[in-house]
Amino acid sequence: MKVTFLDSPEMIDRHWPAVESLLGPSVAELARGEFNVDDLLTMVRCNRAFAGLVESEAGPVLALVFEFRYYPRCVALHVLALAGKRLSEAAMTFWPVLQCLAQEFGATRIEAHAGRAMSRILSGAGFKHQYDFLKFEINQEV
């Protein structure tokens, strides 16, 4: 399997359709209106987020968009979107590469907001449930 990070405008143009095809359905279902794949593309083009793609001989198998979050006492690679096919097989190749990249950028952890199914998958990769993420929608009438 081959890991590619979309780190130039040419790489984005060449590989984004594959990233979009893998992420599109899960982003539409799980992002709950916070962002869509077009927003992710804009973030990647502006260097606000980064995209990665894992491909096998048969084609794309895993896509990821992430950003770095700078907390007062640590840096985290924050997964915005992750989807694919044959995830456990792809993760064997991708996971060590992602960890090295995170360390190169000064991150000491990788974090993700994930639905239940992805949480189960990520738990198998060593992720631990840290806390529950809550939201409160502010309406316009205050």
Mark where each language-model region is.
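Active-site/acyl-donor-binding loops of N-acyltransferases
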Residues: 112-116, 120-142
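Active-site rim helix/loop that mediates acceptor-substrate recognition in acyltransferases
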Residues: 30-50
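Short, flexible, glycine/charge-rich loop motifs used to bind or transfer phosphoryl groups or to couple energy/partner
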Residues: 41-42, 68-69, 100
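Conserved donor-binding loop and adjoining core beta-sheet/short helix segment
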Residues: 45-88
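Short amphipathic alpha-helix that is part of the acyltransferase structural core
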Residues: 1-35
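Acyl-donor binding region in acyl/amide transferases
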Residues: 74-124
